[in-house]
Amino acid sequence: MDRIVIPPTYKPKKKFMQLAIVEAKRARDRGDYAIGAVITQLSGNREVVIASAGNRVKTSGSSIKHVELETLKYVSSGYGRYLPDFVLYSTHEPCAMCAGACVWSKIGAVVFGVSQEDITAYGKKHGTEEFKWRACLISCKFVLEKGGLHIPVFDSFLRLECRKLFRYRASQTNTFR
């Protein structure tokens, strides 16, 4: 079993999730799902942004262009296959595919805002085609636990702010409706 280098005293930072929220709004503005992600690197007492992006599933026409996968691929291309000193922030709970990628990359920690339950409940309540996502309801925590690396998960981080993304619509004023 490999050692994860994120210290046990690690606390997620609001500013990084807020950047993921900004990226989610940009994704929505260009016609995609309002999902954003940021990957940071810990170096001593510092934590710096290495990558940030918004989802591209709709605009790319590829069902696997999840923002978590895309940011992990980008960071791996410059920092190597394993990322034990990196933290993934996502506005939405990573799906089973993205959580699996976190295991394979040996990410140091995962922080997310809204849960799969939040996402599913919103889709059922609003019943629009846009929110009838195909979902494999296997929790991120379950996948990470099965990976055997003891990757820390910080769930429901800035959850209320991330839930507002469900209502976010592209507009000239970028307001919530």
Language-model-detected regions and their locations in the chain:
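A short, polar/charged loop-to-alpha-helix boundary motif
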Residues: 56-70
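Small-residue (primarily alanine) positions within well-ordered alpha-helices
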Residues: 20, 24-27, 37, 51, ...
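Short beta->alpha transition motifs characteristic of CBS
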Residues: 48-57
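Short loop/turn microsegments at loop-to-beta-strand junctions
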Residues: 12, 33-35
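Zinc-dependent deaminase
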Residues: 1-27, 101-177
